Amino acid sequence: MNRFLTLLFIFFAICTDISAQEAEMEQHLFDTMRDGDKAAVVAIHIGAEDADAKQNIEKFNAMLRKAYPTIDFREAWTSRILIQQVHSNGGGNIPTTDELFSQLNKDGYTHLLIQSSNIVNSTDMQILRYEVDAAKETFKQIRLGEPLLTDETDYEEVLKATAAAYGSEKEANVLMCEGTHGSENAQYALLDYILKVQDYKSWFVATSGGYPSLSSLVKQLKKQKVKKVHLIPFLFTAGSKATSAIAHEWAQQLQRAGYKVTTELHNLSDVDAIIDIFENHLRHAEMFHRYSPKELKMMTR
């Protein structure tokens, strides 16, 4: 990346409160274990609303199990609505993060290594950080891996992998993202900027309910005199139901604007290189202890 883009990334990192900026020291998690200690690897997801979404989640979970085959595996969801749907359909009881932490503590676990399937440092991710920091009083060691898009290299590798897997040379490629009115929109705006700086011709980013918006996308398409658009779900845990609903709505609006639209049927969970980035973040969390704001404050007293 050029110097300007690096400075821009730092600015976005500050605005979105990306905790990768915190101090850390090398300390392998499992090397800190003593006789009688118990460890678990934990996957955190928003949840799954259909069978396809469950398969996407399982690909992520399989990565964690394969990375640490001798360590107990556990899973929690953050959406109580999706948890209730599964329970109502006879799919068993899936704990929330707090419920899982409480149960692991009761079961004698002392060391937790956690990775979520969040794409950006969203509100959900920030809540998870708070829950993990609060649980540090309960466990001897608890580590949390970063979301998919965290540092400069992540953005470059994710775009490279997505383009290789789903890019179309004959159409304008549009990454469909789940934006909100929160700070995570800044990360999608940065993603869009990096596409342009890295010379990804005819590639665009748009979000549902956030920025860059679909209306801003149409303005860009008109400037480049685009006629055909290829929609690519920049999603991970979403199943076919949710993906189809978003794609259908976008396709209708783009068609009304005069564009021919095709839609990619797969998402990021089907790209091995994306799964590898999540694993890299998990292994980094295992190898490095990151000081929380509370720990840093105590160290400076």
Feature map (PLM): residue ranges:
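Sec-dependent N-terminal signal peptides
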Residues: 4-14
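Sec/Tat signal peptide C-region and signal peptidase I cleavage site
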Residues: 16-20
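Active-site-proximal alpha-helix that buttresses catalytic centers in soluble enzyme cores
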Residues: 21-301
